[in-house]
Regions:
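Periplasmic peptidoglycan-binding/tethering modules of Gram-negative envelope proteins
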Residues: 1-57, 114-120, 125
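Periplasmic OmpA-like peptidoglycan-binding domain that tethers envelope proteins to the cell wall
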Residues: 38-40, 61-125
Length: 125
């Protein structure tokens, strides 16, 4: 997986998106917050970008598919965000102050359920 960076015009507001890393998601198996080794390359590429651009931060937003209860989906989406953040911080040494975490529960962003089981990565100011 290669992460391409696209510069976007954005207002100067706090936490506004200034870059989007492509692909912008780390995907997960159903009811899992374990990062699959095939998805870790996306985390690695994100970390390399952060090391090359020490003035940027990331917003990680966790999602779940439509299966399960609202409560269960909120829990799993939060666990997914924490898994990605923990890897970025613990394994790769990025300062936790450069990470903003959020979780939304159910996502209908994509037509395929398996694509909605993800953490969306956005580079922010």
């Amino acid at each position: 997986t290669v992460v391409n960076v696209v510069r976007q015009e954005a207002p100067a507001a706090e936490n506004s998106v200034i870059f989007k890393a492509l692909p912008t998601t780390i995907n997960f198996a159903f009811n899992s917050s374990k990062i699959d080794p095939t998805q870790e390359v996306g985390v690695y590429n994100l970390v390399q970008f952060m090391k090359e651009n020490p003035d940027v931060r990331v917003r990680l937003t966790g999602f779940a598919d439509k299966r399960g209860t609202e409560k269960a989906n909120m829990i799993i989406s939060e666990r997914r965000v924490n898994a990605v953040a923990d890897m970025v911080i613990s394994k790769y040494g990025i300062n936790k102050d450069r990470i903003v975490k959020d979780h939304k529960g159910v996502s209908s962003r994509y037509d395929k359920d398996e694509w909605n089981r993800c953490v969306l990565v956005e580079i922010i100011k």
